[in-house]
């Protein structure tokens, strides 16, 4: 699947995805400062399902055509299986397809791929407005940030919470939650994933 955005420093002004793509290669092309850049297309959730938000795609993930295919990313998918968001037998190489199949969605603050932690705060902050627009259009039940840095930038302030509900943080009227960090202690991970499991089980049918 491919598309082209208008000129912009990060391609964030391209049209927001409405249709939910089927399984397969999720690569797309945007324009960044007038040059084509390969990235991953947004995978919108169904209304009143969960929207997971990361920082930006890794080059490994873009090359694979699927979200979160580096080491930390695959840990994220494993955690969603533990939380029963995804079936326990979900293949990691196409876990984003399984996420879409159960009604949830995924996007990033910044669509330009970089190495881990290479994206600047300024570049990530530039994507917050577009994220608001996506949430307003898609209307998920809640936003779940994969990483605390993404949550902090979207909130526009420091966050005390290590995981769970983010009081006072909402996007387009939707509540926001944070997953435990990739290197969080096991007890914290277990508590956080149980919390996420409870959120998912409370979603309307």
Name each region found by the language model.
Residues 101-154:
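Internal catalytic-core helix/loop-beta-alpha segment
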């Amino acid at each position: 699947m491919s598309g082209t955005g208008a000129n912009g420093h990060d391609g964030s002004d391209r049209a927001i995805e409405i249709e939910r793509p089927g399984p397969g290669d999720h690569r797309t092309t945007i324009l960044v400062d007038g040059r084509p850049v390969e990235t991953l297309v947004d995978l919108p959730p169904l209304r009143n399902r969960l929207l997971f938000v990361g920082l930006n795609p890794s080059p490994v993930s873009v090359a694979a055509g699927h979200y979160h295919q580096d080491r930390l990313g695959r840990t994220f998918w494993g955690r969603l299986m533990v939380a029963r968001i995804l079936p326990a037998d979900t293949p990691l190489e196409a876990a984003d397809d399984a996420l879409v199949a159960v009604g949830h969605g995924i996007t990033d603050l910044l669509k330009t791929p970089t190495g881990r932690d290479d994206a600047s705060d300024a570049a990530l902050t530039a994507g917050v407005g577009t994220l608001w627009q996506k949430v307003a259009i898609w209307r998920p039940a809640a936003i779940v940030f994969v990483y605390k840095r993404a949550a902090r930038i979207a909130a526009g302030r420091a966050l005390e919470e290590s995981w769970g509900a983010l009081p006072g943080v909402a996007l387009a009227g939707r509540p926001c939650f944070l997953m435990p960090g990739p290197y969080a202690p096991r007890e914290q991970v277990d508590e956080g994933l149980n919390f996420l499991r409870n959120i998912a089980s409370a979603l309307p049918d």
